Design a protein with these regions (language model features):
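Conserved AdoMet/S-adenosylmethionine-binding subsite of the radical SAM
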Residues: 81-177
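Conserved alpha-helical substructure of the radical SAM core
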Residues: 2-75, 79-97, 102, 110
């Protein structure tokens, strides 16, 4: 492989300087309740690779030792990891801001009852994506019924937000290329 550092040294491109590490993004596993055609980790319902309890404890240890301020949870559907709630509780007990990259449909999956309330009680920030405003486009990309279930998930989060004042909920618009 060709070394790239000499190429950077000989350019007028501004130097890239790193700041102190404050955010840790953790993929809790590849299992997901959706089958998105565009998934960059090829997650899906048949994937079984999930972070184990020992590794979750290492994450909590790292958060504590490095005094990190933000834990960004992703997957697959991170909520499908059996240690998700313990990790969230542990991080929040350390005063760490937690972001859940949620696909919204997980909120209505069997076994996930009370998830919206849990996220609210823990003060978790939910970052969710919806690739398009069109039900047909979303369902074509993510699976039948995903658009409608996503809207239902947003409504559930909105209801919880109204009941628990400290919950912050936002919707970001992403432009497609």
């Amino acid at each position: 492989m060709r070394p790239t550092l000499p190429l950077l040294v000989q350019t007028d491109f501004p130097a890239i300087r790193r700041r102190a590490l404050d955010t840790l993004q953790v993929n809790l596993g590849y299992k997901c309740n959706q089958t998105c055609l565009h998934c960059h980790v090829n997650a899906g319902p048949n994937r079984t690779e999930m972070m184990d309890a020992d590794t979750v404890q290492l994450v909590l240890d790292l958060l504590r030792e490095r005094r990190l301020t933000t834990l960004d949870l992703t997957g697959g559907a991170p909520e499908l990891n059996e240690h998700f709630r313990d990790l969230v509780r542990g991080a929040r007990a350390l005063g760490v801001r937690v972001i859940d990259r949620c696909n919204l449909t997980i909120l209505s999956e069997p076994g996930q009852e009370g998830l919206a309330e849990f996220l609210a009680e823990q003060g978790v920030e939910v970052t969710a994506s919806l690739p398009c405003y069109s039900p047909a486009n979303v369902d074509r990309q993510r699976g039948d019924g995903v658009f409608e279930r996503s809207i239902t998930g947003l409504l559930a989060l909105n209801i919880v937000r109204q009941q628990v004042p400290q919950v912050r909920a936002g919707l970001a618009r992403q432009r497609s290329r």
